[in-house]
């Protein structure tokens, strides 16, 4: 199972028109953060006296999506109407949700993510450069 799911999905759809996923992917929910927002979070923390106390901060978005929904979203952006999704294997240790609580960074550093998943995928796929 790939460590980096978005590049795996894009490459599989472009090369084969299908994606192989674990059975868990039918239910698993994830949130994805764009690098722009990661960098903005670091800058917000460095610029906040209140945040410079040695604390650990979760940096994430509240936007949840299942892996299957992610495949469908990426496929639609690639012009693939009905992507073939093949399910095989199961990872028992794979949590159903990987969603972080970001209340502390939002309050102390006044940080909010600004890049939505769909927009980040457009950037990744080069759509914004064409428009």
PLM-predicted stretches and their roles:
Residues 1-6, 29:
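Flexible, glycine-rich beta-alpha linker
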Residues 13-131:
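C-terminal substrate-binding subdomain of Rossmann-fold SDR/epimerase-dehydratase oxidoreductases
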């Amino acid at each position: 199972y790939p460590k980096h799911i978005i590049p795996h999905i894009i490459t599989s759809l472009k090369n084969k028109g299908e994606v192989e996923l674990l059975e868990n992917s039918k239910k698993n929910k994830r949130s994805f953060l764009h690098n722009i927002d990661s960098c903005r979070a670091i800058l917000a923390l460095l610029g906040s006296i209140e945040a410079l106390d040695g604390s650990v901060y979760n940096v994430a978005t509240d936007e949840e999506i299942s892996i299957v929904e992610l495949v469908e979203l990426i496929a639609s952006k690639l012009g693939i109407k009905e992507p073939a999704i093949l399910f095989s294997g199961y990872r028992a240790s794979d949590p159903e949700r990987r969603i972080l609580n970001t209340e502390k960074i939002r309050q102390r550093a006044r940080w909010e993510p600004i890049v939505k998943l769909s927009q980040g995928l457009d950037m990744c796929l080069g759509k914004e450069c064409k428009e």
